[in-house]
Amino acid sequence: MTVRKNQALLTADEKRRLVAALLELKRNGRYDEFVTTHNAFIIGDTDNGERTGHRSPSFLPWHRRFLLEFERALQEVDASVALPYWDWTADRSIRSSLWAPDFLGGTGRSLDGRVMDGPFAASSGNWTVNVRVDGRTYLRRSLGAAVRELPTRAEVESVLAMPTYDMAPWNSASDGFRNHLEGWRGVNLHNRVHVWVGGQMATGMSPNDPVFWLHHAYVDKLWADWQRRHPGSGYVPVAGTPNVVDLDDTMKPWNDVRPADLLDHTAHYTFDAA
């Protein structure tokens, strides 16, 4: 059984193995396929049209499946690897070990945002950004520049306390847990972290930055935490809702999995802590 650990607790060997697996997926082309898929859904998901990966109830199960697919790809390279999660309420500084040269590397230089250290820096020669919005082929970050503070634990707790998963109009204007976690309403959790990191993380091509996977692993954990606190509150909508994914509808691009199939993460992995 895969155990997803807090990235702050990874051993040096676990970090090394994860980095090596990421670099291999990049080398063999599979990594960029995930970037392309994510960007297609960012572009296609709209408040008034069909929406699957974002701005909709299926934001959480869609990303759960997306991360599962990516984690399995990593494990085909190295079976010992699991996706760690980044608890940004605790590791909220640009000096956190997450950003060290032996792991993800740090922020970008002020001139152009280019990441200059770590295994994913352009100078390593191993991380050319191929799926991109412009001619810049290097990983970019501007940690804490566009928004100064990452979400706090108190802000997370305020969202975890919300008793209803989602509600009409089932988009970025909705009240409820999903939309507050996604970040279109209220304290802005998930979206704010993308903006705090900056660079490619602030675009539809956000998986170009490996921190995407650690960020979304934590968002996924928060969904699991919410489920445990609200066992009587399930995924909604259940049926007959235009433009969104109901409980038993299949989700694109896989077309073989429903939100109902992804409500229990323990069939696939557990977390190191509640």
Residue ranges: model-predicted function:
Residues 1-274:
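C-terminal accessory segments of proteins
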